[in-house]
Amino acid sequence: IIGRAHNLTETLNDVTAHAEMQAITAAANVLGGKYLNECTLYVTVEPCVMCAGAIAWAQTGRLVFGAEDEKRGYQRYAAQALHPKTIVVKGVLAEECAALMKAFFAAKR
């Protein structure tokens, strides 16, 4: 593990401070470069379009996510947003990930 992150949008009052963005920055800082083509990014829920764009720009080698996001997920709005060489694995522990996200947002409200 070269980087870990979580959503900091409320803490930083920054709508771009999603966990994926934080993790990409952390990994790039550790590696000393902006390309993550030999890295795997694991996330609880499908990235949004903004995060998918960052994942593409970082040329992330693999993306693994649990729950799909039917409202804001990149697949709904920009299915081709990721780098063409990025391997996508979806549905890993999907039910558990969906429950985590439901609890997370319930605590925010």
Locations of regions flagged by a protein language model:
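Immediate flanking context of iron-sulfur cluster ligation sites
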Residues: G33-E46
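Residues that line or immediately flank small-molecule/substrate-binding pockets and catalytic motifs
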Residues: T9, V43, A67
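A short, polar/charged loop-to-alpha-helix boundary motif
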Residues: L8-T25
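Zinc-dependent deaminase
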Residues: P47-R109
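A structural microfeature
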Residues: I2-G3
